[in-house]
């Protein structure tokens, strides 16, 4: 995940401090496949970070642990409490795949983009790793997002690549890498790119966010 400096400050001050799980980036370089190693754009803040990178599961674990300690928070398994909804004047659903959303918000808009995002983490020789890199390749955008001085997250979005083999993705990463001395490319995970929205966000006492 990427988070801007202002949003990070808000999160730390108003929700919970997450400084221990972020990696600060001071620069973004943008390249084009046609111009080889010539920069199209670059954004830089030499004194402070432009934004930060963090792992989704680490953020989830911190929030989950904090909520469980909160005396005002209670976790309920709705599969075990069939009639619990009747006890509330307002019910808010924040999960598009939850039983509440599926039952009370049936009019939905799903758009598919015929693209898949392929993600992995590369392990490489230690460097000062505070610059994110985006390359607009002929196959789609490829992002190198540092998460430590010797590890970098990769996100490669490729059109019509549902059946693209992991070894092919790894070969493309090697082809476009001009910065890191890669020691290992970890397992590649693939996700279909699509957007989901509701036609209505309220239904009687039920709200969706």
Model-derived segments and spans:
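N-terminal glycine-rich dinucleotide-binding loop that anchors FAD/FMN and/or NAD(P) in oxidoreductases
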Residues: 1-22
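Short beta-strand to alpha-helix junction loop
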Residues: 2-5, 44-65, 161-167, 193, ...
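Conserved N-terminal helical subregion
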Residues: 13, 22-105, 110-118
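A structural signal for short hydrophobic beta-strand segments in well-ordered beta-sheet cores
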Residues: 30, 144-146, 201
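Short hydrophobic/glycine-rich mini-motifs in sensory/regulatory modules
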Residues: 52, 149-152, 205
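Short gly/ser/thr-rich secondary-structure transition/capping motifs
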Residues: 72-78, 187-196
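Conserved FAD-binding catalytic core of PHBH/FMO-like flavoproteins
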Residues: 96-193
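FAD-binding beta-loop-beta segment adjacent to the flavin cofactor pocket
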Residues: 192-208
């Amino acid at each position: 995940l990427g988070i801007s400096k202002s949003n990070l400050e808000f999160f730390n001050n108003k929700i919970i401090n997450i400084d221990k799980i972020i990696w600060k980036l001071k620069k973004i370089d943008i390249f084009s496949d046609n111009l080889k190693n010539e920069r199209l754009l670059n954004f830089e803040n030499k004194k402070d970070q432009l934004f930060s990178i963090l792992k989704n599961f680490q953020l989830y674990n911190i929030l989950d642990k904090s909520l469980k300690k909160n005396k005002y928070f209670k976790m309920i398994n709705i599969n075990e409490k069939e009639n619990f909804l009747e006890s509330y004047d307002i019910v808010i659903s924040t999960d598009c795949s939850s039983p509440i959303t599926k039952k009370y918000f049936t009019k939905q808009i799903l758009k598919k983009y015929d693209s898949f995002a392929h993600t992995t983490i590369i392990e490489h020789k230690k460097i000062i790793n505070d610059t994110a890199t985006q390359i607009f390749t002929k196959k789609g955008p490829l992002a190198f997002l540092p998460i430590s001085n010797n590890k970098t997250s990769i996100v490669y979005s490729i059109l019509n690549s549902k059946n693209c083999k992991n070894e092919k993705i790894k070969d493309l990463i090697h082809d476009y890498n001009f910065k890191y001395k890669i020691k290992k490319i970890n397992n590649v995970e693939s996700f279909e790119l699509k957007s989901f929205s509701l036609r209505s966000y309220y239904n009687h006492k039920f709200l969706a966010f």
